[in-house]
Amino acid sequence: MSKMPAKKKSCFQITSVTTAQVATSITEDTESLDDPDESRTEDVSSEIFDVSRATDYGPEEVCERSSSEETLNNVGDAETPGTVSPNLILDGQLAAASAAPANGGGGGVSARSVAGALAQTLAAAAASVSTPGPSSATPSQPPATCSSRFRVIKLDHGSGEPYRRGRWTCMEYYERDSDSSVLTRSGDCIRHSNTLEQTAERDSGLGATGGSVVVVVASMQGAHGLDSGTDSSLTAVSQLPPSEKMSQPTLAQPQSFSVGQPQPPPPVGGAVAPSSASLPPFPGAATGPQPMTAAVQPTQLQGAVAGGALPGPVGQGLPPPPNVNLAQPVALAAQPGPAGGSSLSQQFAYPQPQIPPGHLLPMQPSGQSEYLPPHVALQPPSPAQPLSTSASATSASAASFPLGSGQSVSSLGAQMMGASAQPSEAVAPGPVPVGQAAPCQPAGVAPAALGGVVQPGSGLTGVGQPQPVQPPQQMGGSGQLPAVPGGPHTVVPGVPNVPAAVPVPSVPSVPTTSVTMPNVPAPLGQSQQLSSHTPVSRSSSVIQQVGSPLAQGTHSAPTSLPQSDLSQFQTQTQPLVGQVDDTRRKSEPLPQAPLSLIAESKPVVKPPVADALTNPLQLTPMNSLATSVFSIAIPVDGDEDRNPSTAFYQAFHLNTCQESKSLWDSASGGGVVAIDNKIEQAMDLVKSHLMYAVREEVEVLKEQIKELVERNSLLERENALLKSLSNNDQLSQLPAQQANPGSTSQQQAMIAQPPQPTQPPQQPNVSSA
């Protein structure tokens, strides 16, 4: 851990991230993270969370000094005020509030997610949401700050290894905070968000927030199984989802504002409803949104309401069977509710297929495997949904999104899938169910689920929803959805796909994937997701989630998602996807403003692409829900950092999943490359040393040879000279001389003194030779 801090220290921005976490973990005592962070942490700890958060936010932002961070900074400020005066406007806020209640950290996540959304309003709403979820509002706020920090770090690093390192550092730091804050909830939330954020971070500074939410959800799913132990973790997840919700709302914030306000009353449910409300605006089909809202609200009431009533509805949704039931009712509600009745109905059908997944979900393990089939089945529906449905559904789903009811359509289907991806929770519920599913899963999750979008799937779904929200996009991708279906189940419909993808990977992973699918434009999305929907789902989902929150909040999500997808596809595709997303967003009126944000996100997201590619491998190993969640986060970070982060995760409760994932990351990814490079370097060193040694030996031998040759020539000359000077008698004595060199030499010396000196040495030389 000390190592990690050092690393973090290496990245100044990362340190800032730590501070945010400290604030979050303040409950715990500012664990001494890094000294720099510590000072901040101390301030935060001394101050109330909100205050510390505001203070932290500013300083952190400053430290991180990433343009994105600055934006976040503003957002953070807004967030803090939001905290003071909660703006329930955003469904995200509502979700955040619900999440906060569910989990202290949850709210923070929401805030963070909001920050990721980039929409300052979102941040403000998130802050307010956090406040509404007072119990966890404080913690959640710090997480939000953390997320922004992460984002900032990411942005600062930009693309390239340093960027990765920074992201990693951030992640590790974040995790560290979570650990130190060991607050089960706070810590878990933070950790989850951290994981997500890591991924998001990679994806994009802003993206991180969304991603973190998704990741949390996935984690939640895994935790759901654990429930008792993981409760905190689940809670964190649920919280994250809410934050995601917030993000989603961000886009529609203004739009969904009206919706959001009405929704505020039902915090959790409200959150979902707001989501739907906000989404509807996205869809741009006011009617869609309104009906959606109505439908959503009902659905919300059914399942999302459960969000607020998570416990109660969750009771409903909680039981796997109920989940299924809920999903159906939700789907039904969505169907009737959504303005796009047809699309909703289609989606409804789609969600229903998910319902089975919901059933499966209850058994997360089998649910996942089973999910795929359902997803596949869903996929067809997706195509059935087609874009038209998708579009209509999208708007409806977007509108419904909150509830998941509308979303149920595309999003819902997606959410459902995402929910299903969330194994137990979202799936059964389906979009709305997501909310319900979430309830099913953990109470905390329920809120997220309520967010519906929030659910892991939801986060992803949220992403997907955001896409759905952007009917144009979906429409543009109408072919996309169908095509997606053709692709892996994950790929399938952007939204539906999400669920499918989500379930397949690990729950967490799946959500990611599902998100990815939706976000990814039809072409890229299809190929990317097809090629590596699961892996992509993981990192891309994170990215997408980031984008998704943005997308919903800012429509950035689409771009982000594409990016994440692209990231899987790799940067090459990314640009294209990003462009497509941008175009789509542009086509969509609401999204346009967010588009700029998205554009910013994109670059950030791109760097993560490589990570995403790496992730695919991770995905497989990370099948466990928690693992997938963590894996998402880890993949995002640089390979080098991954290993350390692995150590970190190991230290933490999530450590097992994380560990396996981390190991995986190390094995597949930059880690291997780094090892190879080092081996090569070592070999080169050995070669150079050997070459030097050989050369030296050769030189020495050459010199010796030269000396010997010279001596030989000298002796020959002397011999010739002696022969010429000698007389017959002496020559006749040569044989005797050879026999008796001593005598001969004496004679020679007497005869010719000059040769004498040379000759005696000669003889010894000869003998020696």
UniProtKB/Swiss-Prot annotation:
Coiled-coil residues: 691-725
Superkingdom of this protein's organism: Eukaryota
Biased composition regions of type Low complexity, renumbered to the chain: 269-279, 531-541
Biased composition annotated in UniProt, kind: Pro residues: 754-763
Tissue expression from the record: Expressed in the cortex, medulla and papilla of the kidney.
CDD domains cross-referenced by the UniProt entry: ZIP_TSC22D2
Subunit description: Interacts with NRBP1. Interacts with PKM isoform M2; the interaction results in reduced nuclear levels of PKM isoform M2, leading to repression of cyclin CCND1 transcription and reduced cell growth. Interacts with WDR77.
Name of protein: TSC22 domain family protein 2
Pfam families assigned: TSC22
UniProt family annotation: Belongs to the TSC-22/Dip/Bun family.
GO biological-process terms attached to the record: negative regulation of cell cycle; regulation of transcription by RNA polymerase II; response to osmotic stress
Keyword annotations: Coiled coil
SUPFAM superfamilies documented for this protein: Delta-sleep-inducing peptide immunoreactive peptide (SSF58026)
Composition-biased stretches (Polar residues): 229-252, 542-563, 726-745
Region called Disordered, residue ranges: 20-86, 224-292, 334-353, 520-563, 726-769
Gene3D superfamilies tied to this protein: Single helix bin (1.20.5.490)
KW Coiled coil (keyword) present: yes
Record gene name: Tsc22d2
Organism for this UniProt entry: Mus musculus
